[in-house]
Amino acid sequence: MTSVRKTMELIKELVSIPSPTGNTYEVINYIESLLKEWKVETVRNHKGGLIATLPGRDTSRHRMLTAHVDTLGAMVKEIKADGRLKIDLIGGFRYNSIEGEYCQIETASGKMYTGTILMHQTSVHVYKDAGKAERNQENMEIRLDEPVHCRKDTEELGIGVGDFVSFDPRVEITSSGFIKSRHLDDKASVALLLRLIHEIQTEDIELPYTTHFLISNNEEIGYGGNSNIPPETVEYLAVDMGAIGDGQATDEYSVSICVKDASGPYHYQLRKHLVQLAEKHHIDYKLDIYPYYGSDASAAIKSGHDIVHGLIGPGIDASHAFERTHKSSLRHTAKLLYYYVQSPMV
């Protein structure tokens, strides 16, 4: 089985490459170069996602597995009179989850600037309502790490409306086996799929069905994996994080098998097949329901594709904020993926 340490190191590399939805070219290039090194056939779709294909014995029925490499982020909405930046969020999260975070601003010419996302009324020595003021677009801003005093100063740096903003991942691997970072959703799963591909190649595993691996790049806005699905595809498995919180079964130490999200139930027979594989191979798993969640698989169903769809992934604490998971969850997810791609279809 693939090394969890190598998976965690790959996650660290991936989260360190900024890739907010809409600006994923650099990380897609990086992944494409890895797959080329491993002599894996790839093609890009027009949306900018990457599809890798491994041939199988049965070429009439295909599988597709997907994970998304796009992350939460922001765009410059306005340059304020004092030279600071108002932002517009990309993806589903709240301003409080990025308050105090370091960030990067990429200009249209490709130049990078750094800054910090702050409340305008941050100083408790000046603003009486510093703790009570609402964290919203009007009150949050980017303080640039440049000597700017007015709108013109910022414009002269080349910064403008529509420039992408990415957040510092602050990635760290602990001695106790955790990896904590922004954007484990869903770069942890991308790393798992890449390590699976590498394992299939190096072990010369013959897959029962031709299998496609889609690295999607628009999942955080709802349509990453809803197209470019080969017509022979029967099973479609999204690999994405399991969410942890009150009333949830998911934890940081097992693989999550989603039975239902905001789109409705996932395919019952595929769910049962995944559970049977987990029990047969002594894989720790949790069945769970995510009420405010969607995936590439649910997006594909909504787009009208006639597929058997499923969703599994590592359990991620504090999703869409300061995320964390444990090597145990990564190991169990990797194990289930390994046995799934070699199993018969439902």
Curated annotation (Swiss-Prot):
Its cofactor is a divalent metal cation. Binds 2 divalent metal cations per subunit. InterPro entries: Peptidase_M42 (IPR008007), Peptidase_M42_aminopept (IPR051464), Peptidase_M42_dom2 (IPR023367). The active site is at E219 (proton acceptor). The keyword Protease applies. One of its GO terms (biological process) is proteolysis. Keywords: Aminopeptidase, Hydrolase, Metal-binding, Metalloprotease, Protease. Pfam families: Peptidase_M42 (PF05343). A divalent metal cation 1 binds at H68, D185, D240. The keyword Hydrolase applies. Its EC number is 3.4.11.-. It comes from the Bacteria. One of its GO terms (molecular function) is metal ion binding. A divalent metal cation 2 binds at D185, E220, H320. Belongs to the peptidase M42 family. This is Putative aminopeptidase YhfE. It comes from Bacillus subtilis (strain 168). The lineage of its organism: Bacteria, Bacillati, Bacillota, Bacilli, Bacillales. The gene is yhfE.
